[in-house]
Structure formats: structure tokens, C-alpha cells
Amino acid sequence: MNSGTVKWFSDAKGYGFIIPDGQDREVFVHFRSIEMPGRKTLQTNQRVEFEFEQSERGLHATRVVPLPM
């Protein structure tokens, strides 16, 4: 698993971006990839662990686990 910080996440749109630790690239995250009970959302600057894949549209998270704040 990789670690990173949420750059931003829109509840209305259901997606946002994560910045992996030590990198300047962004990883797209959709709410369906968030592993948590209840409402699946993330907060700006929240720490997460995640897995990601490369697609034709860029990097996207496939599994996101929010860390305690």
C-alpha cells in the first residue's frame, strides 16, 4: 500500500485527488474506491493508504483506506 494526502475531494461529485508521499503527481479517487463503513467521503489534507493503477486517463486509486485523523 502507498501513503498519501488528500488534495481535495468533492462530496457532490463523488471524486477527488490524492498526492502520494514524496511525489508531485496526482492520483484520481472515486468514492467507490474508499473502504469505510457508512458514507464514503474524504477530507482535504486527510492521510490515506491506497493502491492505484495506470489507465489511459492517468493514475486512479483502486483501494483507499482513510487513516485516523
Q: Where are the regions that the model predicts?
A:
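Short nucleic-acid-contacting surface segments enriched for D/E, G, S/T with interspersed K/R
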Residues: 36-49
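Beta-strand secondary-structure signal
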Residues: 3, 49-51
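Alpha-helix boundary/capping detector
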Residues: 30-32, 42-44, 68
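Non-catalytic, surface-exposed connector residues within folded enzymatic/regulatory domains
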Residues: 28, 42, 55-58
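S1/OB-fold single-stranded RNA-binding interface
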Residues: 2-33, 38-39, 63
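OB-fold/S1-family single-stranded nucleic acid-binding modules
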Residues: 54-69
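Short beta-strand micro-motifs enriched in acidic
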Residues: 9, 51-55
